[in-house]
Amino acid sequence: MNLLENINSRPLPLAQLMGITFTHAEPDKVIARMVVRPDLCTLGHTIHGGSAMAFADTTGGAATLINLPADAKGATAIESKTNFVGAAKEGSTVIATAVPLHRGRRTQVWQTRLETEEGRLVALVTQTQLIL
């Protein structure tokens, strides 16, 4: 089973609920896509900050899982910081790209860029995962 199949074979209820699709997975990069549906938007018809954060958290979490040390039982986020830079309109597709900043035995730090299909930055998220 390759890394993308590994991620896609896991039960990820929030990812399924939000319509997140993982399209690429390697140790140094995980990419996912999500259509900005009306139920994921603000009253102004742009992606809600909570939806953006959940999308980034899900992508960074998946990246952590495929990079766990062999003796790890799992991981949990212990810190997350989001810089909101731009908007993504209802109906558009947002792409999340997670790359590692640090991969240690006890913690991993991932940075996830959320961009529109046109390449406009929506948010930049940095999260720290505690390895269990």
Ranges and model annotations:
Residues M1-L132:
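Terminal targeting signals and extreme-terminal segments of soluble enzymes
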